[in-house]
Amino acid sequence: MGTEQSRGAPLKPLDDPTPLTGPTIDVGVRIGWLLRMARLTAPERPAHRLGDMVTRLEWLGLRTSTSSLHRIETGAVRDDRVVAAYEEALALAPHSLRASIDIVCRTFPYSPVDRAPVHRVASPEEMSRLHEPVLAGDAVGGQWREWARAMAQQGNVGLPVDQARDRVSALMGELVRSHGTSYLIRYDALATLRRSAWGGVVREAAEAVLADPHVQMPNDVMSAVGEAFDDDTRSWMVDLLGDPRELLVEGAAIGLGVMAEAHAAPGFWAPVLDRVVAHYNAVAQDQGERWRWLSHVLRLVPADELAAVRGDVAHPPSPVGESLRPAGREALVRACQVHAEESSAALGLPYQPLLARLLFEVVGEGRSSRSHASALLLGALPGLRRVAVDAVLSIAESHPDPSVRERATSRGASLVHDYLPPTVRRRLQEADELSAREAAWLAIAGEQVDEAVLRRCLRTSDQLFGPGRVLSVIGIAGSPVLGEILEEPGWSDEVRGAAAWWVRTGTRLVDPQPGATDG
């Protein structure tokens, strides 16, 4: 795809200088790197020289210079106007770069501040235009995001609270079944509302979602709720750690992780740590997913705070694979570097050390908020997403440490979207038996999953409910098996309830690409 250059001189590849798994990351250099990768790897119109990009942006009415773009592409400056112009000039999905950057910058409160002036809706007519597709129920991702950003601005023409709550619930229903840029744009819309005066409405809508006894996909909703901190919501999430439904324990753990990262204040855990320990102690050692997620929450607590209550912890937390421990991490780091070398070459670029760092965080970072943010950056661009899928699924299939394979298998699903490596696709399509996670890769990629394989999974797997599990595969795929479950005798109330939830919620959602036509 060409050589990255500015005025004829090769640009030095960017890297994050902060310690691996340390307390902070360099957000600025990451978002600058994403913009550089967008310019160099755009599938239709890459710009291999900064001077070429300056010319394109001038065609769009944005006057700039190579030195200004260099500062933006190295993370020294953050400017949403330039990000929007990159999307247009490079023919990328509208809002894809802006949404991913906004999400990452919200997650880490020490992120660079956007110097672009906030666009304010200037008239009731403009606000009505933004309301229209949302109220009609046919908004695509970018329309959801524009609506949410306008709603979040004080003084705009909003909606009655009940109507707003209904629309937020609809957004949540779309979020949990969307993938790729369709997902990240909707997530940004929901998180934007959560961080606004409408945050309480988002919390109420989330409570209603979780009140359904058969809810199947709570994690993304809980993650978005966790983007804003208040004592009551923190307490509510801690209470959910004791919920009898394992799915909600997982969702609460993820929400608390995001809240702790985004809040970034010392003493976040102190007011609730005794209750966290009590929930942990109520679960027997080796008690499956519940024990694993409660162990995950304990690991989120700073070491000095956890040390103060360690004597109250009834038994050791779930083990971490050797390759995920500090002492054994070097081999996984090197594996990610090798994949980054191969991926960089596939993109026509010199070795990108920041790509290796992001790959490691997807598969090796214990904090789900960190891995989620890294996956969003890798998933924002078609070329990056493909090489990241190649790398993560290779680790999932071949790494010697089973704990690494399990984590890569699970987290790889967030990157798959519309692409599977050809060898992986062929193997899965020809297999008579698949794990739930493997079947999920096919379903998320929009590939047909054989009904006989799905039924075999349904009758033999112990992973039926929740993200990446058998019923989510059947639901995302829109398989006729869903309706058959509701008609056939012999299925448990829990299985029937989950199938009915998917029928109500809908199947895989991906926004139409700009310029696509029907037929």
Predicted region positions:
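A short, Lys/Arg-rich alpha-helix, primarily the initiator
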Residues: 1-49
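Extended amphipathic alpha-helical coiled-coil/heptad-repeat regions
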Residues: 164-517
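Short alpha-helical "recognition helix" segments of helix-turn-helix
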Residues: 47-58
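Recognition helix of helix-turn-helix/homeodomain-like DNA-binding domains
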Residues: 56-78, 101-105
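Key DNA-contact positions within bacterial/archaeal DNA-binding proteins
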Residues: 51, 67, 95
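Helix-turn-helix/homeodomain-like alpha-helical modules used for DNA recognition
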Residues: 106-177
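Short C-terminal boundary/hinge segments that cap the last helix of small helical domains
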Residues: 25, 91-107
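DNA major-groove recognition helix of helix-turn-helix/homeodomain DNA-binding modules
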Residues: 76-97
